[in-house]
């Protein structure tokens, strides 16, 4: 079948069909005269692609589906969440999604409407592309950027599927081989499709460690930042973390690499053939570059604890006092360093996900505050000065620059708790159980425009890092403001206020705020509340997969192709 016949049959333009072939979604045979010959299988694949694209599924996600890295159900759940957050905008697509599973699985498309593909063709890209990979706690993401044209070309996200069930409920571990295999498959898909990749950058979940042997192979699971073993009682009812502080005067939180290693040493859980340890992103870099010993960026090394940020070295005296100097410590750099190559593509040293997210979300590092409100919340700003603070964490960024970071345990989660409260009342009234975010958001906006004095909400449902025993409170309630809308607005102000309390007085020299995170996107009034509190303009970032984007930009800088 010729391309003109395919176009007439399924309503796709020639440009779109060739674009899908360019992206590797179809592989079309050619006749002896060089003309493409489309088979029934090609037409079926194009019908599937068109159907998925009309439902709003991205080209990169379709690629993952065809490569068997995600299931159709994975894509549908992801798309439904996207649509629910922008329900009015995507109402017609929501109807399509609801009927999609049966139609797709039975190859029933019957699409007569034409569809115009708007994605960027490879031919429009420069030869200065970079890839970023982010190994997150639940997903692995990748993004491709064109540094010359300053665009984010394509993004991919898959479930990491690496969690390992262990007997002790305080332990939280993942399989490093599963994580690396999936990350490498993503990189292979990208490098097969894009021939102008000049750099690969890596980031991922900080604090956690994986033990390695002398050959650079993992000899343990990844013990993640969510692990709570160091919070268990040690002696005299103090925790392992408490004991670290008593012996060294250094605070190392549970889930941090050295707190985990301390627990493992005392309880004989360090594998016999352990030589060193590293983060999961460092381990991926080692596998990509076929190196055997970890080189850590300072942003990652600091996340383990017991690290001298100014001197760029581990605190060996404190480590010796704890009796845990039984491994060879990784090397550390604060430079834009190329560790090695993967398929002749330079691979930069891995950086921490907080730092990568900052780089990926913020254009002007020195003038901008980043407020990220997801399940928790985090506020970050760049400083050139070295300063330590009890409520703020100082983290290395790049040479001679640091991030001052304040983190709250319950950001958007607080709003979710409120939504669950309202939904339970509605369900008890025999109405269908469904999300009530749209209704609450409308009430919050109405309350905001009224400008009344709202109830004061301290959303400490999970305590504070400095005091885990704290509880949430609601006060300043009056007859006038005790309404669902005013209460919900109080929650929004409480969430934003906790972020402001970390850095507010220090923000006078900054010019703008970049807001990111699902809560900011799902609660429209939050942008205005943040702006009111800080007295600065707020822009909600449209960047996708900010940590992966930041890793790509870091790698691009490492090879000299970053124009920013």
Describe each region flagged by the PLM.
Residues 170, 192-224, 251-255, 285-308, ...:
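Short beta-strand-loop/turn "lid" adjacent to the catalytic site in phosphate-handling enzymes
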Residues 131-132, 144, 238-251, 262-279, ...:
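Active-site core segments that coordinate phosphate-bearing ligands/cofactors
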Residues 76, 80, 87, 180, ...:
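Amphipathic, non-transmembrane alpha-helical scaffold segments
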Residues 50, 64-121:
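Short, charged amphipathic alpha-helical surface segments
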Residues 197, 327-329, 510:
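Core-facing hydrophobic residues within beta-strands of well-ordered domains
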Residues 124-220, 246, 273, 345-349, ...:
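N-terminal glycine/serine-rich phosphate-binding loop of ATP-dependent small-molecule kinases
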Residues 1-64:
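Basic helix-turn-helix/winged-helix DNA-binding cores
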Residues 227:
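Carbohydrate-associated surface elements
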